[in-house]
Each structure stands twice: as C-alpha cells, then as structure tokens.
Amino acid sequence: IPTRGRMNNQITWDSIGPEAREYAALVCPQEEINWHTKQGRDCINRGEIKGINNVRQFILEHAMEAGHDKIIVLDDDLIFGRRISGDLPNLRKTNQEEMHELWERMEWLLMNHTHVGLSPRQMNDKHFPDTVKYGMRQNAVHAIRPEIIHGLGIRYDTMDLMEDYYVTLKLFQSGHRNAVIVDWTWDQRGASGAAG
C-alpha cells in the first residue's frame, strides 16, 4: 500500500481484513516508518522516492528482489463492497472476516493473467450479472505478476501521470489481457493529506 502523509488515517489498511494484514505492508517514506510500526502496521522503507509512478516501480522491483511472484498494490484510501446476492446488482459493504475471499480470488486469477483488477463502485451495476470481465481498464487495485511486467520492459516510471493506465495499455499491447472482478468493488472514502 503506497502511502505518504496519512499517519492517522490508513483506510485501506483498516479495510483489507486480518488475514491480508499479515502479508501487507505500507510503502512509505523513512520518516513515517516509526509511527506506522508503533500502530502495528508493517512497513517497507521507500527512502526519498516520491511520485506514485516512481513508488509503484519501486514496489515492483522490491517484490522481485524479495522473490514475490504475485503482489497486490492498493491505493491507501479504499473501502470495499460486494454484491448482496447473485440475483441483483445491489452492493453492500464488506466486513473484515470476508475480505480474504477477494484476495484469494485475485491470487487465483493471477495464475492465468499478468494483471488483475477490481471494479470501482461507480457504475458497477452495468456489469451485472457478470462476475469477471476481461480487457478492461483498471485503477486503485492492481494485482500483478512483477517478473512478467519487468520481462516485457514495462515500467511504471515511464510516465509521470496516469502510469497505471499506461502499464495496463502496454500489457494489452503485449498480448496480456487482464481480468477484472466485477461482483466486488472498491470505493474511495477519501482522506485528508497527501497520497501515495
């Protein structure tokens, strides 16, 4: 979870569920590490790296160095929802105990896709009754295979803005379609302070 300046308001960290928090880490500047660890949050020190494009590239490279073949990169201000049932497009807020279902599903989809996303809440009803769609834009939630992206020479830091869209489009161009889960959603509650 790339973050900066949101010391007291880690919405995504609080939303991902206890199982995910065992594996998750905030990717933050050196000066924020002590505060977050005192709050029980694991951290990765990104040093002086600034700009979400550069931070995403740092995360990809760090994951490869650590031997992670699959990772999920999340914006730091997300809450999650899911369909109430398979009969209607209506959504409900998720609870902590069920969030592992989403992460396990994303991991499973990564077995056959280089990148997996999650539908935003806005306009989500247009996807009903599908549960997964392919070849869609994705943002805020990025499950990726770092080695494949690196092997293709695709870098987040190539673009100053819209780097997530750039990487998605470059993967499409390279023949790697994505899978986007559409019966679960992300939404941005919003928080004060700098992002990423």
Regions found by a protein language model. Give the residues of each.
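Short beta-strand/turn micro-motifs composed of small residues
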Residues: 1-3, 28, 117, 182
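Short, well-formed alpha-helical segments that are part of the catalytic scaffolds
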Residues: 1-20, 32-37
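Active-site-proximal specificity loops/subdomain of glycosyltransferases
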Residues: 19-74, 79-91
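A structural signal for short, well-ordered beta-strand segments and their strand-loop junctions
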Residues: 70-75, 114-119, 178-182
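Conserved catalytic core of nucleotide-sugar-dependent glycosyltransferases
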Residues: 81-165, 173
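C-terminal catalytic/acceptor-binding lobe
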Residues: 159-161, 165-196
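Short, solvent-exposed loop/turn segments at secondary-structure junctions
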Residues: 6-7, 51, 77-79, 121-124, ...
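A short acidic (Asp/Glu
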Residues: 10-12, 36-37, 82-86, 126-132, ...
